[in-house]
Curated annotation (Swiss-Prot):
This is Superoxide dismutase [Mn]. The keyword Metal-binding applies. Keywords: Manganese, Metal-binding, Oxidoreductase. It comes from Deinococcus radiodurans (strain ATCC 13939 / DSM 20539 / JCM 16871 / CCUG 27074 / LMG 4051 / NBRC 15346 / NCIMB 9279 / VKM B-1422 / R1). Homodimer. GO terms for molecular function: metal ion binding; superoxide dismutase activity.
Length: 211
């Protein structure tokens, strides 16, 4: 079962002006496609070729040593981006405010004190991730936490590989290819804009499944 590039659940220009159409098209058809292609190449002839990518990245300790680096980077990239596209949309909040509601909002308030405090902690994790990587909202032991990972690592890989653990329910890509065309080196501006396109309905579904 070869991995395939997932279709976006919206048009490339759907997230404008916050994330521009050209960035979305290149990010999806070039960068993500490359991760898919390289993951498939590394998986050829292995017993792991039929695993869903989320399961594969949780079992990297079982992967042959000569495949581990390629799969950590490329299966990780495929998993990360597949989630990234899903947790974005045109903003779906109550009364026009793009923020979560219900159990997820209650859990955020419990874990971080307020939604604004959570946003600040998440942005700080993303801003201070040196070089390329991701910031994540994860569920761990039934509780929410904010973590970050380098390169294409994912919390599902576990602490031994990624340095953190948990089930991610929200993630933001801070590789420069995710924002450079529109924001150049202004990562904080990109992160501030990101909140306008988070699909909290999708994040809430992921929280309900992970808690």
């Amino acid at each position: 079962m070869a991995y395939t590039l997932p279709q976006l659940p919206y048009a490339y220009d759907a997230l404008e002006p916050h994330i521009d159409a050209r960035t979305m098209e290149i990010h999806h058809t070039k960068h993500h496609q490359t991760y898919v292609d390289n993951a498939n190449k590394a998986l050829e002839g292995t017993e792991f070729a039929d695993l869903p990518v989320e399961q594969l990245i949780q079992q990297l300790d079982r992967v042959p040593a000569d495949k581990k680096g390629a799969l950590r980077n490329n299966a990780g990239g495929h998993a990360n981006h597949s989630m990234f596209w899903q947790i974005m949309g045109q903003g779906q909040g109550q009364n026009g405010a793009n923020q979560p509601s219900g159990e997820l909002l209650d859990a955020i308030n419990s874990a971080f004190g307020s939604f604004d405090a959570f946003k600040q902690k998440f942005e700080d994790a993303a801003k201070t991730r040196f070089g390329s990587g991701w910031a994540w909202l994860v569920v761990k032991d039934g509780k929410l936490d904010v973590v970050s990972t380098a390169n294409q690592d994912n919390p599902l890989m576990g602490e031994a590989i990624a340095g953190v653990s948990g089930t991610p329910i929200l993630g933001v890509d801070v590789w420069e290819h995710a924002y450079y065309l529109n924001y150049q080196n202004r990562r904080p501006d990109y992160l501030a804009a990101f909140w306008n396109v988070v699909n909290w309905d999708e994040v809430s579904k992921r929280y309900a499944a992970a808690k």
